[in-house]
């Protein structure tokens, strides 16, 4: 059940980002959370279209695109710690570092696979709000497909100590990707221990990206 939610949310993320893509790279203003989301969107999908011939031959190239264009703006360390939840305090420094790396790889694989679900969509970004003094901001997005109700997305971003912003969660139709994963991971750590969970994530990350016949034309 969770994997379906996760892939659905990741697919919606990339579909929403795709609708803002244009032809030229845009400088990413990490000091403005609203500008950041749109700029990262544009650059990620510009790279996607530029590398489509490579992707057709090697779908795993999508992992490189996600790593280069998307992940620098994802606070995967913060997300990893949130996912570990109450188990964080009982882990060693080495375990935390290994888990963060494994969870980062999991996100890369998840978003790379979501690219294969890409179809042309329309997206609406409501005007940004005043974020001065805020530590966390919700960037709302409406994903629009003809003949269907708009899908409500929310990118949750947080301000870092240097004043820049990074995203750490996606909420799709009220379902938090981070909260869903936290529930699953917490249960697995309790049952198997953190080391086993790390190994399981690492093993998942070794899987290849598979093309989808009903999504992107790769």
Residue spans of the language-model regions?
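Boundary of Sec targeting at the N-terminus
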Residues: 22-24
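Surface-exposed, charged secondary-structure patches
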Residues: 109-151, 204-218
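N-terminal signal peptide c-region/cleavage motif recognized by signal peptidases
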Residues: 16-18
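Bacterial N-terminal signal peptides that target proteins for export
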Residues: 1-9
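Solvent-exposed loop/turn segments at secondary-structure junctions
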Residues: 88, 105-106, 130, 145, ...
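Low-complexity, intrinsically disordered terminal/linker segments enriched in charged
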Residues: 172-218
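Short beta-strand edge/turn micro-motifs at domain boundaries
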Residues: 152-179
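Early exported N-terminus immediately downstream of N-terminal targeting peptides
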Residues: 26-111
């Amino acid at each position: 059940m969770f994997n379906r939610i996760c892939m659905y949310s990741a697919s919606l993320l990339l579909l929403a980002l795709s609708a803002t893509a244009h032809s030229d790279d845009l400088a990413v203003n990490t000091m403005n959370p609203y500008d950041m989301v749109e700029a990262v969107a544009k650059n990620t999908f510009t790279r996607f279209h530029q590398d489509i011939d490579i992707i057709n031959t090697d779908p795993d190239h999508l992992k490189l695109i996600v790593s280069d264009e998307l992940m620098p703006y994802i606070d995967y360390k913060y997300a990893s710690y949130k996912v570990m939840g109450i188990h964080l305090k009982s882990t060693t420094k080495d375990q935390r570092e290994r888990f963060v790396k494994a969870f980062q790889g999991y996100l890369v694989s998840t978003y790379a696979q979501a690219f294969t679900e890409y179809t042309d969509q329309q997206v609406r970004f409501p005007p940004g709000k005043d974020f001065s003094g805020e530590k966390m901001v919700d960037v709302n997005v409406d994903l629009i497909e003809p003949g269907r109700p708009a899908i409500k997305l929310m990118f949750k971003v947080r301000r870092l100590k240097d004043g820049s912003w990074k995203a750490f969660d996606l909420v799709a139709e009220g379902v938090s990707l981070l909260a869903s994963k936290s529930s699953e991971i917490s249960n697995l750590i309790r049952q198997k221990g953190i080391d086993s969970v790390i190994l399981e994530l690492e093993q998942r990350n070794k899987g290849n990206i598979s093309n989808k016949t009903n999504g992107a034309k790769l």
